[in-house]
Amino acid sequence: MIVKFIVIIFCTHKYNQLYIKKMKEQITYDIFNKVDIRLGTVISVKKNEKARKPSLVVEVDFGKEIGIKQSSAQITHYYNEENLKGKQVIAVCNFAEKNIAGVISQVLILGSVDSEGKVTLVHPSQKADNGLPIA
């Protein structure tokens, strides 16, 4: 089952409003199968001081096969170092790296974005092994 309203946490409030109003164009299963979505555990969190909008630099352990990857994420409304460290998250692991405010973002952590631009991260309902693929 594909959830229709999961969006990448780097979207803006304006983009979010447009996204909720209209579903994106359909894709084939072949295209979806190219997206490598994995489960990982947050091992470190710090503020991204260079970012224009409040952001966190999050390091996630995706297990032996993928290793530790980092992401710059605009998730500061609900999350901080204390409540995010140790939490399991779901991320797209095979996007090209992107420099975001001086941080090389290697993965895109997934979350839902409400009408005010506040992000709630997607996470498993129970603890699972790092690196497991999401199908």
Give the ranges of each region predicted by the language model.
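Intrinsically disordered, low-complexity polyampholyte segments enriched for Lys and acidic residues
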Residues: 4, 14-16, 21-22
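Phosphate-backbone binding interfaces of nucleic-acid-interacting proteins
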Residues: 22-135
